[in-house]
Regions:
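N-terminal glycine/serine-rich phosphate-binding loop of ATP-dependent small-molecule kinases
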Residues: 1-94, 122, 150, 222-231, ...
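Conserved phosphate-binding loops in N-terminal lobes of ATP-dependent enzymes
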Residues: 59-72, 130, 137-138, 145, ...
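Short glycine-rich phosphate-binding loop at a beta-alpha junction
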Residues: 70-78, 153, 206, 394-403
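Active-site core segments that coordinate phosphate-bearing ligands/cofactors
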Residues: 6-7, 19, 112-125, 135-156, ...
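Short beta-strand-loop/turn "lid" adjacent to the catalytic site in phosphate-handling enzymes
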Residues: 66-98, 127-131, 162-183, 206-209
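Carbohydrate-associated surface elements
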Residues: 101
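Short acidic-aromatic active-site loops that bind/stabilize oxyanions
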Residues: 46-54, 126, 130, 207-211, ...
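Glycine-rich beta-strand-to-loop/alpha-helix junction loops that act as flexible
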Residues: 77-81, 210-211, 258-261, 398-406
């Protein structure tokens, strides 16, 4: 009988439990549980509801029991940078504030009193983003110093869920690298940097690599769900898992992990922490097997998701794509990476305001708004592809788009046209596939990453756009 492996993939807007197993030499997936996610306002801050989310994680485990498909292992992946601080009794200190909150405004200047941006990049290789853990911790230090005094443990979001499942405190490497406090040379916390910033060393747990067994379910959770399994750390940063699932074994490609964010880059064995790389705002995030994801964060489908939400989700993404195609000659463009689009009160109005401010024609219909966003994204991809080629001194023949955005046919066509490269779209469930793949590699269902990626290609295929 085939062994089942469970990926709990929690994104910014929803979470899913997806079970995978091998059947006739192919990987087969089944989504068994889904739940909503999103930040809520609490005490004037944008916060995650981690207590509710963890109940949903447990509910999905109960669903496994209910349908009689009990996994041998499971792993949780989420977005990057966010964390909890625990006191000596393992209680959460303060609100579980999310990365879109404005508490980090001005915190970069506080960090640069201890270390310059240039030196920080040389040490960590991580691109500057105001929501990185390093700046969030500075916000805690400035606004709630008592939390840092009381904190015994820092856990990133997936590590926190693994702790609630097992009672074991770990910090997984790929997630930790997103926070800008890890050395790409030692692949460990940069304790000297941590000391310079005045963050307590004792909070930072030992880093573990993806594929490491964390432990079995605690007695309490085991009794609640009715079975036991091993919790295995995947690449807990969702992009790290998605990149593991890119169905290619050569190195002649750029990938885009396309979802709420678009993460566009290449895999490499060494980090590039040069001044030029810093100026170009590339980042060196940790990947599976000690590889680096050399990439750029691009706003991604967040903009179109927000616009859809503002019309009360009255249209599917496919319908919005069709409207965009009808308005394809609309001439205006926006900078998809402008921070004004990170957390606006109203995305539709923000796009209009941007066009107005820059002296362009202002979009009025939903189709016009959508075509501005999609075309701007495709042009941003083309610009980033050129920058990657400039930084690496080589050209790439194709772009692999994985994740939910790989299903956006119109955007894929625009990207092929803008980049003049072949687009290989799929698999859409790349993050869950990568999560399950890390578990299967540990269980020796696959001997190597290369074998796993070959099977992923055979199992899910790709759609080619030229």
């Amino acid at each position: 009988m085939a062994a089942y492996y469970l990926a709990v993939d929690i994104g910014a807007s929803s979470g899913r439990h997806i079970i995978g197993h091998m059947e006739n030499g192919k990987m087969v997936l089944e989504e068994i549980y889904r739940f909503e996610n999103g930040m809520v306002k609490k005490d004037g801050e944008l916060c995650w509801e981690f207590d509710r989310l963890f109940k949903e994680v447990v509910n999905g485990l109960k669903k496994c029991k209910e349908i009689g498909k009990i996994p041998v292992s499971m792993g949780v992946d989420t977005w990057g940078v966010d964390f909890v601080l625990l006191d000596k009794n393992d209680n959460v200190l303060g609100n579980t504030v999310g990365y879109r909150d404005h508490r980090t405004e001005g915190m970069d200047k506080e960090v640069y009193k201890a270390i310059s941006l240039k030196d920080l990049y040389a040490r960590t290789g991580i691109q500057k983003a105001d929501y990185n853990t390093i700046y969030q911790l500075m916000a805690v230090k400035k606004k709630h110093p008592e939390y840092l005094e009381q904190a015994e443990t820092l856990l990133h979001v997936p590590d926190y869920f693994h702790f609630l499942l097992t009672g074991q405190k770990t910090c997984e490497y790929t997630e930790a690298t997103t926070g800008q406090l890890v050395s790409p040379i030692t692949k460990d916390w940069d304790y000297e940097l941590i000391d310079m910033l005045g963050y307590p060393r004792k909070m930072f747990q030992k880093l573990i690599m993806p594929g490491t067994g964390i432990g079995h379910l605690s007695d309490k959770i085991r009794e609640e769900v009715g079975f036991d399994l091993e919790v295995v750390a995947p690449a807990t940063h969702d992009t790290g898992s998605a990149v593991l699932a890119v169905p290619a074994n050569d190195d002649d490609f750029i990938y885009i992990s396309s979802g709420t964010w678009s993460l566009m880059g290449i895999e490499r064995k060494e980090a590039d922490c040069s001044e030029k790389s810093c100026e170009m705002n590339f980042t060196n995030e940790g990947g599976y097997a000690g590889r680096f994801r050399y990439l750029k964060n691009i706003m991604g489908l967040w903009m179109i998701q927000s616009v859809r939400h503002e019309v009360n989700d009255a249209y599917s993404f496919a319908e919005i794509c069709a409207m965009a195609e009808e308005a394809k000659d609309f001439p205006s463009r926006v900078d998809a990476n402008d921070e004004c689009f990170l957390s606006p009160d109203n995305m539709t109005e923000e796009v209009k305001d941007y066009c107005r401010r820059t002296g362009q024609k202002v979009p009025e219909t939903l189709g016009e708004i959508a075509t501005v966003i999609y075309t701007s994204l495709a042009e941003c991809y083309a610009k980033t592809a050129k920058e990657l080629e400039e930084m690496t001194g080589r050209t790439y023949s194709r772009i692999h788009i994985v994740g939910g955005g790989s299903n956006a046919r119109y955007l894929n066509e625009l990207t092929a046209k803008a980049t003049k490269k072949e687009i290989h779209a799929g698999p859409g469930e790349a993050t869950a596939i990568g999560n399950i793949t890390a578990q299967m590699l540990k269980a020796e269902e696959f001997k190597t990453i290369e074998e796993a990626r070959t099977i992923i290609h055979e199992s899910f295929g790709v759609k080619v756009y030229k």
